[in-house]
From Swiss-Prot:
Name assigned to this protein: Kappa-conotoxin-like Im11.3
Compartment list: Secreted
Cystine pairings recorded for this chain: 29-43, 36-48, 42-51, 47-64
Family as reported in the entry's similarity comment: Belongs to the conotoxin I2 superfamily.
Signal peptide: 1-26
Tissue specificity as recorded in UniProt: Expressed by the venom duct.
Amino acid sequence: MMFRLTSVSCFLLVIACLNLFQVVLTSRCFPPGIYCTPYLPCCWGICCGTCRNDNSSLTFLQFCLPFFFFLRPSHPLFLLLPAR
């Protein structure tokens, strides 16, 4: 019984350590020009599919509008644009 309890607790400890390493190793940001998502953020600037520098006080849509013009109407990101 003691061997089983020890092996189970070691197994759970290994799983907890692996989860901790995953969080530590994936908590990073990306420089300009690299692909980004809300879960893989930019170090600075705005994520418009790729990280872009924001050197002004532009809003998200003003800054990302050139990127959105290249999207097809069936693309999910196209729905973020205001109705015309």
